[in-house]
Structure formats: C-alpha cells, structure tokens
Curated annotation (Swiss-Prot):
It comes from Saccharomyces cerevisiae (strain ATCC 204508 / S288c). Residues 51-65 have a biased composition (Low complexity). Gene3D superfamilies: Tetratricopeptide repeat domain. Pfam families: ChAPs (PF09295). It is a peripheral membrane protein. InterPro entries: ChAPs (IPR015374), TPR-like_helical_dom_sf (IPR011990). Member of the CHS5-ARF1P-binding proteins (CHAPS) which mediates export of specific cargo proteins, including chitin synthase CHS3. Belongs to the CHAPS family. One of its GO terms (molecular function) is small GTPase binding. Residues 51-71 are annotated as: Disordered. This is Protein BCH1. The keyword Manganese does not apply. Component of the CHS5/6 complex composed of the 4 CHAPS proteins BCH1, BCH2, BUD7, and CHS6 as well as at least CHS5 and GTP-bound ARF1. The complex interacts with the cargo protein CHS3. Residues 711-724 are annotated as: CHS5-binding.
Length: 724
C-alpha cells in the first residue's frame, strides 16, 4: 500500500548530504552492511520553468558526454551540494525492494516518483506540489564490499556507479553492454547484480529473524520496509534467491552469522540462515532440494544445509536418514581425507548438533542426546552452541551440577551483536524529520496513541523495573541467562546457591586462597575442597546477580498482587510497568504470569511490546494444545480441544491485525512473526474464512491492509500450501 503518507523522509540541509555521508563511511560498513538509501531531489512548480529545463539539459549533457568524462566528475555533478532555487533534497532508508538488476530498480523508482505527479504532498502541514527530478538508490553489496548507486533522472537516463571500500568510484556498465563483451571487466556485471540482490534479501530476512526474540524491533524511524517476497518486479524473489544461491555459496562466510555462531563456516552463516528461512516461509522445498543436490556434487558438505531445510519443512524422516548416512557411511564427505581434519570436525560438529537438538526437542531421548552432544563438544569445543545444547540436555536430565559446569564452560562472545539497522546519515535536527501518519488503514486505539504520552509514561515508571539489567543482555549472554533461569525454575534459588558453592569457587575466594600460602597450610582441608572445584567465570557470576534481581522483582510483584486481590482492590500500574513485569516473568520462564501482565497492559492502552509477546504466547499455546491432543495421556475431549483452538485463533487474528496496523503506522509492511502467526489461523480455518473474520471485525481499509501484507503472501507466494 505505497502512498505519500507511507514514506518517512528526512529533509537535507544541503542537497546530496545523505549520499555524501554514506560514501564517507563506506570503508566502515561491516558484514551485512546498512539498509538501502533512497534520496530524492524535488522541485516546486514556481521554479519549474527554469529548473526543469536546466535539469533536462544537464541530464542530456550527462548522457551524451558520459563515455568521455571521468566517473568521479560525473557523480560530483549529479549530486552537487549547491542548493538550486526551488529544489530540496530528502532521503530515507528502505528494505525489501528488488535490486536484482537496473530495470527492477528503475520500476521501483518510477513508483516512488509517480506518487507526486498528480497529488500535492502535505509537507510539514502545507500542500506542496512537488516534482521529483532525480532519485538515487544505494544498495550495499556485502560479498564484494561495494556500494552500488543507481541514479534515475526524471525524465531521462539511468546511470549506475560502484563505490568500493576505499571510496573509489567507477561507472558500472549496463547489463546489455556487459553481454556484448566490450571488455573483460564487463563480465563481472551480472555477478555484481546477483550479489547485490542476494545481499539485500539476506538483510531483509535477518533483520526480522535475528531480532525475533525482541519483537523484530528496529530503531531507524526513517526506514520503509516492504515484504521482499512480494516486491519482485520481474521474477519471483524466492525462486531467484534459490537459483542464485550456488553462485555466492563460497562467499557466505563473508556475511558473518547469528550471535550464537562464533566461527562462521560455509554451512553456518547468514546466507544459509536466509535460505532455510526463505524455504520455510515460501514452502519452496522442491526448487531448493533440486538446487542443493546439484551443489552437493561440487561441495559435499552442503548436505548439512539440505538436512536443515528438511527439518524446517517438517521432513524429519528424510533429515534423520541423511544424518545417519553422513555419520556412518564410508562414502560420506566426512570420510574425505583430502579435507583438513579441522574443517571436517567443524562440519561434523554441525551435524551432531542438529542431531542432538532433534533428539532433545522432538524425540525427548535425553540420554542419547547427551552422548551425541558430548561428541559435538569434542569436535568443536570453541563453539557456543555445542556447550549450550549439552547444558540444555543436562537440565532435562535433572543433572544440575553438570548443567552448571557445562554452562560455565560455554565460550562467550564479548563483542558479537545481532544484525541491527544503523543510521548512516545523522539527522541534523528533529525538525527535518517528516513522518506522515498513514491514514489509509488505521485503528483508533493505535492511531490516537500519542508518542509523547508514552515517553512521559516511561519516565514515570518504577526505576527498579526500568533498571533491571537482565533486560539488556545480548548475544550469547542472553542465551546463557535463559539456561540459568531454567535451572532455578527446577531447583529454586536457595538450592541453586548450594549447587554453586558446591561446584564453584568464586573469583574473590580464589584470589584470596592463592595470596596466603601459610594460612592455606593451616586450612588444608578447605584448600583440598577448593581444588576440587571449578573457578566460576566472571560473566556467570554476574548472571547470578542479575537472576537475583529478577527473582526479587518478580516475587515482590506477585506478593503485592496477591495482597491487593485479597483486599478486592485494583492493582494500579502503568502500561509500561506491566510490560516490564511481563518481560521479567517471561525471562524467568513464568509464561502464564507473563501473559496475564501483557493482557492487563493491553487493557489499558495499546502496547506493541505487550501485543507481540502475548501473540507469541498464543502461538506456543496453540502448539502445546495440538501436541497434547495427539497424546495418549490427554485429558481434554475433542470438543474442548476444538473450543480452545478456536479461542486462540480468534485471539491471534485480533493481535495480528492490531500489530500490523501499528507496523503500518511506522512504515513497516513486513513481519515474519505476523506471517507465522496468521498462518496458524489460516491452517485451521482457510484463507477465505480468516479474511471474512477480519472483515467482520475491522474496517475495509484495515482488512485490505491484512490482505496486502499477509494473506496475499500466504495465498500467492507459498506454492499453494494453504487452502482457500
């Protein structure tokens, strides 16, 4: 639903400011890089007679002389910092557009410029009939470390440049010129476009998947996010990604990997994560299987990716058969003596980790899972995930001593963070931010929510809640803390402390013991006990303190609520405080209590934090009921199960619609969480019934928004998986 009001813009003080800032920072871009940057040059009708003519003359001049000029001069002229009369420059970031070739980008650019042709724009409260004379789109090629800049003149030419990590600029020939083979450098043009497209899709998917636990949050308000799967201008995006995957397979390690992967490999990186997620979402199994089987002939280790795809598509038998074949067959790639033992051990640990995770989560064969996980640790002792899985298994086996020892042994990443969007062009003044309110689809409780009121509420919240340090944990520390909370749920705090004192010596105790030898001789028995203990890592000691803070907060909250309930009095808290209570309970694994807090918060006003966390709770409840319904020990009747499923589906639909409208309010038209959530209801009810249910509860524009952003994807981009 692209419209003038769906585009956030930042006004430039000087035309070309954003491009200049981006180019100055090209050498600092890392891994996946920044989102695409779109800049516009707009002119007002009062100066159209002169400005348009000048722009047209400049465009024609640039076209006619382009082969005879230095590319640096051309780019400088195209983005001059001289602010012409009647012209302004604006920019915004964008994700989800099709950057597979110049034609697709030009089509998208035309859609943007067409928005301003006939309809005046409400620009800071005044109607302005802008004409877009120039638009540029910059997209980071993460494989080659190039920034690809496409400049579209309205009307006129399309020009493309690349800026390498050293800031050097050069013109990129067109695809047609490359096909004619005018020089050897042109042969790379198609590859550059393929890499640029793949880089963009990886960013689009990973910004959602990497931040899923945080509700897919992103803090760049001047960012417009489309669904990449429905944005293909010339080809199906998912099929195109699968087709091009082999071309960049060997470069996947350059993109880095999720935070729990400390050492990216060919089969464990952001590129592979994206492929698996795309196949899971679009149900493109057959196309992917065909591609991977060909790739395996050249790169046998790619069988690990195929196994992951099988699990993602619920083909557990096929996946397990492949794992057993690779681990036990003499023809397996693991038996290839031509590969170094280190590389083989990495691949073997990945296979074993997949196998142990399956035994742990699906088969619940914890003893066998432990044997497999221990072998995975032996193969890759420097990887976090192998130790993480082993710790989880010890917890399931109720072996808390070994669980704590394994947790203490986890290799931690001090610097690695999730992929997040970073501002490349600083906003010089808040007054330059133009953030229109999309009016095409809105719900009163969402559109009427005043951000300033929410900020005041946050400032008024209980500091003890706001300052809970566990909420700011990142990377592997966040995952390790989750394991510690699982342990304390079983043992309780007092028993956990006993386990800690039994198996660990704390750092201050250790330092004290080594500084007094004479005293140690007197306390021989104590020293002997200390030597049988492990030194508790400082980071784990810190997690114990954070856990104590969370437990104290949770206990005080529950006690207060019980007191007020006993007095038949209402327990008054701000919505932001209910958010924080819910998040604290969720961290500690008290999910029903967390859900109750989120529900109370939503009853007071709309909160995206409460809504997204409550939605995830309903999805998990739906899975639990479905799983229990096929269990021989299920105590629910079929009618009770059906009633529970219907209630949950109804709640899911309600939350999905409201979150989708909230996202639309902030220029976000793509969410994997919402796609997954609504697909649960669609699986039960069918697309048509879900659409009718939404149409009966909400306005036509809101129903159309859900159709455009979610149901259209489920109907037309999932290979006929869902019934109408």
């Amino acid at each position: 639903m692209l419209s003038q009001t769906s585009i956030p813009e930042v006004k430039e003080d000087v035309i070309g400011y954003a491009l200049h800032q981006r180019r100055a920072r090209v050498g600092q871009f890392q891994d996946l890089g920044p989102p695409d940057l779109i800049t516009l040059i707009k002119s007002l009708p009062s100066s159209s007679s002169t400005t348009t003519a000048t722009a047209s003359a400049n465009d024609n001049g640039a076209t006619s002389n382009i082969n005879g000029q230095d590319p640096t001069t051309i780019v400088t002229e195209l983005h001059s910092h001289d602010k012409l009369k009647g012209q302004i420059g604006t920019f915004f970031y964008c994700m989800g557009i099709d950057t597979s070739d110049p034609t697709s980008i030009t089509i998208f650019a035309k859609k943007i410029t067409d928005l301003f042709l006939d309809t005046p724009q409400i620009w800071f409260g005044k109607k302005k009939h802008f004409h877009v004379s120039k638009i540029s789109i910059s997209s980071w090629n993460a494989f080659r470390k190039y920034d690809v800049n496409i400049i579209v003149h309205i009307p006129g030419t399309v020009q493309t440049y690349i800026i390498n990590s050293d800031g050097e600029q050069s013109q990129l020939p067109s695809v047609a010129e490359a096909s004619s083979g005018r020089n050897s450098q042109d042969l790379n043009v198609n590859m550059i476009w393929a890499e640029t497209f793949m880089s963009g899709i990886v960013r689009d998917i990973m910004i959602m998947k990497d931040n899923r636990a945080d509700g897919e949050s992103q803090n760049l308000v001047e960012t417009l996010i489309f669904n990449p799967f429905t944005s293909g201008e010339l080809e199906d995006v998912a099929n195109n990604f699968i087709k091009l995957f082999p071309l960049v397979y060997e470069k996947g390690v350059y993109l880095d990997a999720p935070t729990h992967v400390l050492n990216p490999s060919l089969t464990n990186n952001y590129l592979v994560e994206t492929l698996v997620e795309i196949v899971r979402l679009t149900k493109s199994l057959e196309a992917c299987r065909k591609m991977l089987k060909k790739l395996i002939e050249i790169h046998p280790e790619a069988v690990i990716i195929l196994i992951r795809v099988y699990f993602a598509c619920d083909l557990e038998i096929d996946a397990v058969d492949l794992i057993n074949e690779q681990l036990n067959s003499p023809s397996s790639f693991l038996a290839d003596d031509s590969k170094t033992s280190h590389i083989q051990l990495i691949f073997k640990s990945e296979l074993l980790s997949i196998q142990s995770e399956f035994l742990l989560d699906v088969k619940r064969d914890y003893k066998l899972a432990k044997e497999v996980a221990m072998e995975a640790v032996n193969c890759a002792p420097n990887e976090f995930k192998t130790w993480y899985l082993l710790t989880r298994i010890y917890i399931k086996l109720n072996d808390m001593s070994n669980a704590l020892l394994s947790l203490n042994a986890c290799p931690m990443s001090q610097v690695k963070e999730k992929y997040v969007l970073r501002r490349i062009a600083p906003i010089t003044s808040d007054e330059n931010l133009h953030l229109p309110l999309p009016l095409d689809a809105s719900i009163e409780e969402i559109s009427s929510l005043n951000p300033m009121d929410v900020q005041l509420e946050q400032k008024s919240a209980d500091p003890n809640l706001v300052n809970l340090s566990a909420s700011s944990l990142k990377s592997t520390f966040q995952l390790a803390y989750k394991l510690l909370t699982e342990i304390v749920q079983i043992t309780g705090w007092e028993q956990l402390l006993k386990y800690r004192s039994k198996i660990f010596v704390m750092e201050d105790e250790y330092q004290g013991s080594t500084s007094s030898i004479d005293e140690a001789e007197v306390r021989g028995n104590d020293i002997s006990k200390m030597r049988s203990k492990r030194l508790c890592e400082r980071w784990l000691d810190n997690l114990f303190m954070l856990l104590y803070e969370d437990l104290k907060t949770y206990t005080d909250w529950q006690s207060e609520q019980l007191y007020f309930d006993a007095q038949n009095s209402k327990y008054h808290k701000l919505t932001v405080e209910w958010e924080l209570f819910g998040l604290c309970a969720k961290r500690l694994g008290h999910l029903p209590e967390a859900a109750k807090a989120f529900q109370i918060g939503l009853s007071q006003r709309f909160s995206p934090v409460c809504a997204k966390n409550l939605l995830q709770f309903y999805i998990d409840e739906h899975k639990r009921i479905r799983r229990d319904s096929v269990s021989a020990n299920s105590e629910l009747t079929s009618s009770q199960i059906l009633s529970s499923i219907n209630d949950i589906d109804s709640s899911i639909i309600d939350l999905v619609v409201k979150i989708c409208c909230w996202n639309h309010r902030w220029y976000i038209e793509f969410s994997i969480i919402l796609i997954d959530a609504l697909s649960v209801a669609v699986q039960d009810m069918g697309i048509t019934k879900v659409h009718n249910e939404i149409a009966s509860r909400f306005s036509d524009p809101v129903a159309q928004l859900i159709d455009d952003n979610i149901l259209n994807f489920l109907k037309n981009f999932t290979n006929d998986t869902f019934d109408n």
